């Protein structure tokens, strides 16, 4: 009987341990997967610094182009498209975290004027939904609905990202006015070179931390290298760790200098930022303009008719 109770206790403990381990795995996996596209959100209250620089450039060091297309003018309480273009060579492959080569992903941050926000699903037309695809946009902060982020998403499918934007209505939002507003955008393709904690990823160049002679290069079992450098100044050994996926530029016995590249640069992506302007137009001004243009057209028509009438009178007088 005691043996049976012992086995039962062991079985319960094993089951509990497995459940706890599984729960930890799920929580950890979820936090990692959801944290990757929101590194900037976790570390910066505002994605645009006072200098105008978007903080994504702190991790994505290479400079690449990005473009944004928005209408010149929009009316209050209407939905419009903001199209962010992140061009790159679709044939390129990047170094993944596991050291293998894979396709590039893309991401973007869109900084709208105060009052502008992501359009609700019921306001988005079927044509616009088709352009958006399966993208899921997030607010940068719960209280910053005018700043939107997306990514990482497959670059081959979403090198052009369509944001559905709802324009504010000054009639219901007294903080909004009929003015010209700036829009800022940042877009990246590929992985970053630096993590938010300041450590390097395996998508950048690794340099020698000391000058001297390379006495040993050890290839690690799971990939990557340990490079032992004998410091020329004091004879001590310095070991530089190279993560997997990188190509070495040095060999054993070679003399190297401090900060000399030990690997080639694997990065094929980069980050870019741009801006555009949009006018929130007063409908009354549009109506006034249409009325003015209509008046001008009518005046021209009356002038033409008057001229023809005058010509007829002159012609009849000449006939007499």
UniProtKB/Swiss-Prot annotation:
A GO term for molecular function: heme binding
Pfam families: Apocytochr_F_C, Apocytochr_F_N
Cofactor requirement: heme
SUPFAM superfamilies for the chain: Cytochrome f subunit of the cytochrome b6f complex, transmembrane anchor, Cytochrome f, large domain, Rudiment single hybrid motif
Signal peptide: 1-35
Main location: plastid
UniProt membrane topology term: Single-pass membrane protein
Compartments it resides in: Plastid, Chloroplast thylakoid membrane
Positions annotated to bind heme: 36, 56, 59-60
InterPro entries: Cyt-f_TM, Cyt_f, Cyt_f_lg_dom, Cyt_f_lg_dom_sf, Rudment_hybrid_motif
Sequence intervals crossing the membrane: 286-306
Sorted UniProt keywords: Chloroplast, Electron transport, Heme, Iron, Membrane, Metal-binding, Photosynthesis, Plastid, Signal, Thylakoid, Transmembrane, Transmembrane helix, Transport
GO annotations of cellular component type: chloroplast thylakoid membrane
Cofactor note (record): Binds 1 heme group covalently.
The keyword Transferase is annotated on this UniProt entry: no
An annotated GO BP: photosynthesis
Primary role: Component of the cytochrome b6-f complex, which mediates electron transfer between photosystem II (PSII) and photosystem I (PSI), cyclic electron flow around PSI, and state transitions.
Sequence similarity: Belongs to the cytochrome f family.
Oligomer status and interactors: The 4 large subunits of the cytochrome b6-f complex are cytochrome b6, subunit IV (17 kDa polypeptide, petD), cytochrome f and the Rieske protein, while the 4 small subunits are PetG, PetL, PetM and PetN. The complex functions as a dimer.
HAMAP family xrefs: Cytb6_f_cytF
PANTHER family in the record: CYTOCHROME F (PTHR33288:SF10), PTHR33288
Protein name: Cytochrome f
Organism annotation: Crucihimalaya wallichii
């Amino acid at each position: 009987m005691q043996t049976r109770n012992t086995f039962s206790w062991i079985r319960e403990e094993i089951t509990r341990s497995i459940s706890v381990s599984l729960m930890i795995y799920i929580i950890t996996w979820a936090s990692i997967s959801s944290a990757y596209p929101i590194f900037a959100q976790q570390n910066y209250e505002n994605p645009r610094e006072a200098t105008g620089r978007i903080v994504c450039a702190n991790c994505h060091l290479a400079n690449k182009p990005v473009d944004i297309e928005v209408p010149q003018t929009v009316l209050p309480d209407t939905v419009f498209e903001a199209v962010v273009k992140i061009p790159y060579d679709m044939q390129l492959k990047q170094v993944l975290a596991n050291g293998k080569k894979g396709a590039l992903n893309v991401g973007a941050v869109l900084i709208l004027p105060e009052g502008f926000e992501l359009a609700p699903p019921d306001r988005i037309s079927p044509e616009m939904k088709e352009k958006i695809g399966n993208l899921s946009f997030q607010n940068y902060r719960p209280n910053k609905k005018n700043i939107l982020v997306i990514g990482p998403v497959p670059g081959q499918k979403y090198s052009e990202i369509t944001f559905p934007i709802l324009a504010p209505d000054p009639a219901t939002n007294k903080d909004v006015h009929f003015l010209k507003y700036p829009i800022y955008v940042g877009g990246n393709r590929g992985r970053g070179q630096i993590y938010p904690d300041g450590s390097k990823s395996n998508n950048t160049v690794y340099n020698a931390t000391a000058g001297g002679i390379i006495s040993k290069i050890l290839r690690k079992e799971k990939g990557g290298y340990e490079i032992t450098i004998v410091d020329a100044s004091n004879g001590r050994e310095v070991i530089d760790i190279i993560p997997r996926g990188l190509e070495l530029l040095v060999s054993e016995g070679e003399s190297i200098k401090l900060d000399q590249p030990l690997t080639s640069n694997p990065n094929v992506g980069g980050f870019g930022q741009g801006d555009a302007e949009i006018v929130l137009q007063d409908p009354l001004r549009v109506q006034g303009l249409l009325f003015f243009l209509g008046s001008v057209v009518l005046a021209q028509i009356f002038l033409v008719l008057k001229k023809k009438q005058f010509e007829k009178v002159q012609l009849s007088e000449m006939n007499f």
